[in-house]
């Protein structure tokens, strides 16, 4: 398994945290230098996600976060990797993480590496809908299908076809269709055309900040994006954004499809309820 950790080259404390965390589990990893607002960011946006530059509801830091993931996917495709595990540099790893991340036999035994899929390793401790699937458990963790929104991109495995799917569609999306990268990956706002997202349960990793909040403790690392993400969450809750979203969906003839998806999600919630994905 190739494990890539997105991190600013200057983030010495966070890189030390990652080195200690992964070494503790004997998990090999590589740092991927995160992008920041710069001419380089503008260049890769123009190349890979041109609509992102015109999306004014996202801050420049959020755009840099989005593009850090996109550029890493492009690199993985260029290298011919069948899948890659992606982490952010405030991640905590759970028990027996090495059995998932230092080897990949378990993955190839359970998933078709030539298909489009995401295995979400992270929990944000929000109540989500998951639906049981036929994928066999591994090391006391299950792989239900994620059927609701679940924010965060601190830890996931993404297949080659899923990376290709996102990059091909991101290249042609207009600005109003682009949201934060976790919105695009882990909500029904963006139509993934049936691509499955499997939620590891209990989760294999979590962000240090959110784990500290869950335990009502102070964060040791904080979050470089938290203020930007909180601002975006306020945008998400605003009536104006909801109006703009509906207008955009209608423009593209997808309002009916989105209503059907919301209805389907309501039925799934009635059948399976919502639960907090634990971390251990």
Please describe what each predicted stretch is:
Residues 1-87, 91-280:
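An acidic/histidine-cluster motif and surrounding catalytic segment
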